[in-house]
């Protein structure tokens, strides 16, 4: 079975870090091995490919901690140690169109990431038959991707199993399902399903909880073609926490070698 995980990097980062850092000071749960996230929590046969959509923070903001670009590049380097992972980059644009003079230029907008994610999923689903995914994981809580899910479920040439992964427990799977069903009914009015007479499989929606994330961390000691490097201190979780949460000792991120 060909499986593909599509990750909205911005949505994952803010979903995990804002929820867990505010709740328990556990922003380090965002130091994620995305391949392990699927293989350990949703195991199945076949090779898994991961496509990660992000943007370099080229636009500096006055209220952000200095060194954001360097932190991004370190994370980008860590990402590349994950097997079968492709990074697709968009860009940031300063938000200078706001009418409020006090906030103008103090925010930035990520451009092309959402569109690139949707286009990539469509290109894969409608591509050569031997390359089409049979199971798609979408790691994003962005409701703007619901029409894409609809296209995968109702319009793709071959049925595709879809699993939506919501980045944090701040979101409810039932709420997403309800919103998707409303979107689906609306879209069916103008875009009839190519499988209208076939009972399609429902969209599976799973919330990434603390145990899933803690069991899917990148190692803190990494190596690539440029040499060895480590997870920075601000991403590391306390040893006592890892003792409690890592249900398999081999999955601990603080083990060297």
Roles of regions detected by a PLM:
Residues 1-111, 155, 160-168:
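Domain-level signal for Mg2+-assisted phosphodiester chemistry and nucleotide/NA-binding surfaces
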């Amino acid at each position: 079975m060909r499986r593909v995980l599509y990750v909205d990097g911005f949505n994952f980062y803010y979903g995990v870090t804002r929820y867990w850092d505010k709740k328990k000071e556990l922003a380090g749960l965002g130091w994620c091995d995305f391949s392990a996230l699927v293989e350990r929590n949703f195991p199945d046969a076949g090779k898994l490919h991961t496509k990660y959509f992000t943007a370099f923070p080229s636009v500096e903001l006055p209220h952000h901690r200095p060194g954001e670009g360097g932190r991004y590049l370190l994370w980008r380097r860590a990402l590349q140690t994950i097997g079968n992972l492709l990074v697709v980059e968009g860009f940031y644009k300063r938000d200078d169109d706001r009418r409020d003079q006090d906030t103008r230029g103090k925010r930035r907008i990520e451009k092309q990431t959402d569109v690139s994610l949707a286009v990539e999923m469509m290109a894969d689903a409608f591509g050569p038959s031997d390359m089409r995914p049979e199971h798609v994981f979408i790691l994003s809580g962005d409701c703007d991707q619901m029409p894409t899910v609809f296209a995968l479920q109702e319009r793709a040439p071959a049925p595709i199993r879809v699993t939506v992964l919501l980045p944090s427990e701040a979101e409810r799977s039932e709420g997403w399902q309800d919103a998707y069903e409303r979107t689906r009914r609306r879209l069916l009015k103008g875009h009839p399903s190519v499988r209208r007479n076939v009972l399609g499989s429902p969209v599976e929606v799973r919330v990434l909880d603390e145990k899933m994330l803690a069991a899917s961390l990148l190692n803190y000691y990494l190596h690539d073609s440029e040499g060895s490097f480590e997870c920075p201190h601000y991403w590391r979780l306390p040893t006592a926490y890892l003792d409690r949460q890592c249900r398999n000792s081999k999955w601990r991120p603080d083990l060297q070698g």
